[in-house]
Amino acid sequence: MIHCWEAMHSCFLDRLAMQTRQTALFEQTDFDYDLNRLEGRLSQLPGASIVEKAMAEVRYYYAGCEVEFSAFQADFTPWNMFEEGGELFVFDWEYARLTYPPRLDYFHFRIQTAIFEQHLPADVICAGFEADGNRLNGIYGDYRFSLKCYLLAVMSLYVNRESGTISRDTYNRLAFWVKMLEQLENSDL
C-alpha cells in the first residue's frame, strides 16, 4: 500500500479521467442524481443548511450545461490499492460512478488518510488544501469548488448506503464533512 500521494496516483486518476470522459447534460449525470438523493435526506443531516447552500452553488454552476465528466472510483484509499512493477492497481469499485467531475478521488485519498492515519481535524485538513491551493487550482481550476463537489459526493454515498435512520458513526462522519464545507465557506480565499 502506498500511503503518501505519489506520481503514480496522479497518473492513475489522469488515465481514469481521460479514458472514461463523456459529455452529458448535468441533469443526466450520476452526480446530479446523487445530489438529488442527498437532498431527499437533508432533514437527517447535521448542518443541513450548509449542505443545502453547497448543493445550490454546485447546481447553479452546472445547471443546464453540457459537462465533461468521468468515472469516480469513490473509495480511492491506500487500503484499496497496491503497487506492483511500478503500476498502481485499484480495487473495491462497488461505489464507483460513471459521470462525476474528474479527479475527485484525489480528495478522498487525502481526506481519508488524514482522518484515519493522521487523526487530523477538519480545519487542519482544509488548511493543508489551502497551502497547496495554487498547485490544486492548476489541476481543478477552482479546487475549493471541486472539494465541495467531493464533500457532497461522499455525503451522498454515506447517507444513501444506509436505509432508514442514519447510524451514529455515519452521522459523525457527516458532521466532520459539514465542518469542512463550513471551513471552505468561511475561508478568506
Question: Predicted regions span which residues?
Answer:
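Amphipathic alpha-helical protein-interaction segments enriched in hydrophobic
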Residues: 143-153
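A glycine-centered beta->alpha junction motif in the catalytic cores
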Residues: 1-4, 22, 35-44, 152-168
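Conserved kinase catalytic-core helix
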Residues: 1-32, 51-66, 70-79
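Active-site acidic catalytic loop and adjacent metal/ATP-binding pocket
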Residues: 60-104
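Short, polar/flexible loop-turn hinges at active-site or ligand-entry regions and domain interfaces
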Residues: 1-3, 97, 117-119
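ATP/Mg2+ or Mg2+-diphosphate-binding catalytic cores
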Residues: 127, 157-189
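Active-site activation/catalytic loop segments of kinase-like enzymes and analogous catalytic loops
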Residues: 103-138, 151-166
